[in-house]
Amino acid sequence: MDALMANYGSDSDDDNEPATVAGGAPEPQEASVLLPPPPLDLLQPPNFVDYSTIAQGSRIRSFPHVEGNYALHVYIPVVIPFNARKQLTLVMRRAASLVPDLYAVDADYALSELCKDEQKLEKVLLGREFHVSLGRTVGIQVHQIDSLVAMLRQKFQSQQRYWMEFNKWEHFVNDDSTRSFLSLEVTRTGLPEISKQIHMVDEVYRLHGLPEFYKNPRPHISLAWALGDVSSKLKQATKEIEKFENSINSSKNCNLRCNFSRIVCKVGKKVYDICKIGD
């Protein structure tokens, strides 16, 4: 998840060379006086949040690393609307009390620790970008990248905006049972459109010899995860969450609606826009 950082030599590296006077002898330089660094508190804004103090979970690669291969993921980016975050904050606090060993997806911080500070919970968990997967996350070779991206862009060149409603709390387990997820699923509004887009991605995957998506796809965003298969815990937790949600909201289900506006293809650390619908 962390971006790779590349170090480049400065264009002004030569400025650090000793000056040369006539005759070729280097001119002696005065020893510089090193000042002590300023207090760290002065370098931090008033609303600074130190996320490094929060316990982190263990990361597990979902497929073996192969030299020369890059992880491919095609998805719809989702940002939770501000008007839905207050209720979700309450729900995630409830989830953390029901399943203490949950972690925030991608951020990988312990949910129970995040819940101690509302600012941390909203910034680390709810303020990030989520995704609805349109294809399996698989490894591809470098020579496949250009062809795959070009075909995806051609497939999705005439997409239109539509609504997605994440209306059902559900739990999922990955293929090798190393992780379980607490998720919000799309079961009504937006399901036909997303299912069609998954089929289109499958067609491109098939042409590149890649495994297709699940036979009966269930579009969702995952908010938290736990190590191993904890289906029984999460199944019971989703029932309790629905009861809790009904007690604080007159509507029957979670009212999280987002507009579809973009599809992204991530290969390794590089992100390609497949389609983007303007306002």
Sequence positions of predicted segments:
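Histidine-dependent nucleotide/RNA phosphoesterase domain, centered on the 2H-phosphoesterase fold
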Residues: D2-D279
